[in-house]
Amino acid sequence: MRQQQAGGVGDGVSPGNVPVCYYGPGGRVPSSLERRARAAEVLLRCAACGLAVLAAALLGADRQTRVFFSIQKVARYTDMQSLVLLVIANGMAACYSLIQCARCLVMAYIVISAVAAAMEAALIGKYGQPEFQWMKTCHLYKRFCAQAGGGVACAIAASVNMVGVALISAFNLFRLYGNSNGGGKATTTTMAGGK
C-alpha cells in the first residue's frame, strides 16, 4: 500500500482513491472544535433520549373517565392509532439511543413522522373537522388532551434533538471528504503500485 500526497501535506488514510481532507492548523481539525462537537452530540443524544422517554410515559399513562348520561366513557391513548404510533416510536427511539449509540437518521425520521401523525390527530381532537362531521373532543376530555399535548410537545423536542444529532453526525462524516483542489489538504491512499 502506498501513500501519495494530493494537494499538500496530510496524513489521513482512505480506502481506495478517495481524498480525505483535514482542515485546521497542521492539517487537523482543531481539538477545541472537536471537543465542542462531541459535547454537543452527547448533550443532544441525552436530551433526545430523555424527552423520548418522557413523551412515551406521558402518553402511555394518559387516560380520563367521563360520565355521559350515566354511561362511563374512558379516553385512552389507545383510542387514537396515531398516539399509539407515537408511544411506540418514542419508546423505540429511547431504547435505540441507550443501546446503540450509533449515528442513524432512521430513528429521527420515524419519530418525526409519528409526531406529524399525532399532531394531525391532536388538531382534529381540538378543533374537529366539520367537512367530515368529526366533532371536537378536547372540550370533553380536557385533562386527557392537556397531557397528550405535553407528550406531543416532548416528542417534538426529542425529534428536534435527533435532527441535531443527525446534523452533527453528517458534519463529522462529510468534513472528512472534501474537494481536494480547494483550500483543504488531502491525502490519497491507493492500492495499486503505479503513480
From Swiss-Prot:
Query: Cellular component GO terms, alphabetically?
Result: plasma membrane
Q: Matching InterPro entries, A to Z?
A: CASP/CASPL, CASP_dom, CASPL
Q: Which residue intervals are topologically Cytoplasmic?
A: 1-38, 103-104, 172-195
Please indicate the ranges of residues that lie on the Extracellular side: 60-81, 126-150
Q: Where in the cell is it found?
A: Cell membrane
Q: Which domain of life is it from?
A: Eukaryota
Keywords from UniProt, A to Z, are: Cell membrane, Membrane, Transmembrane, Transmembrane helix
Query: Topologically, how does it sit relative to the membrane?
Result: Multi-pass membrane protein
Predominant location category: membrane
Transmembrane segment boundaries: 39-59, 82-102, 105-125, 151-171
Member of which family?
A: Belongs to the Casparian strip membrane proteins (CASP) family.
Q: Quaternary state and partners of this protein?
A: Homodimer and heterodimers.
User: What is the name attached to this protein's record?
Assistant: CASP-like protein Os03g0196400
The scientific name of the source species is Oryza sativa subsp. japonica (Rice)
